[in-house]
């Protein structure tokens, strides 16, 4: 369970933003979407490799 303590005098929107950020980092929504339909291991591996290549290209272009 995610706990976000609200500091004294802190805006509720700021606390909500911190909660959303923590929730996003847990990856719960991403995992739920991935589990909606079965993905073959070969397809998952291919996607992972394509993402790695893409990220590498971005990194090289940045330099």
UniProtKB/Swiss-Prot annotation:
One of its GO terms (molecular function) is structural constituent of ribosome. The keyword Transmembrane does not apply. InterPro entries: Ribosomal_bS21, Ribosomal_bS21_CS, Ribosomal_bS21_sf. Signal peptide: none annotated. One of its GO terms (biological process) is translation. GO terms for cellular component: ribonucleoprotein complex; ribosome. PROSITE patterns: RIBOSOMAL_S21 (PS01181). Keywords: Ribonucleoprotein, Ribosomal protein. Belongs to the bacterial ribosomal protein bS21 family. NCBIfam families: S21p. This is Small ribosomal subunit protein bS21. It comes from Porphyromonas gingivalis (strain ATCC 33277 / DSM 20709 / CIP 103683 / JCM 12257 / NCTC 11834 / 2561).
């Amino acid at each position: 369970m995610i706990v976000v303590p609200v500091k004294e005098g802190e805006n509720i929107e700021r606390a909500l933003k911190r909660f959303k950020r923590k929730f996003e980092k847990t990856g719960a929504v991403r995992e739920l979407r991935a589990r909606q339909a079965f993905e073959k291991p070969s397809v998952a591996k291919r996607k992972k490799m394509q993402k790695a290549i893409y990220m590498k290209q971005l990194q090289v272009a940045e330099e």
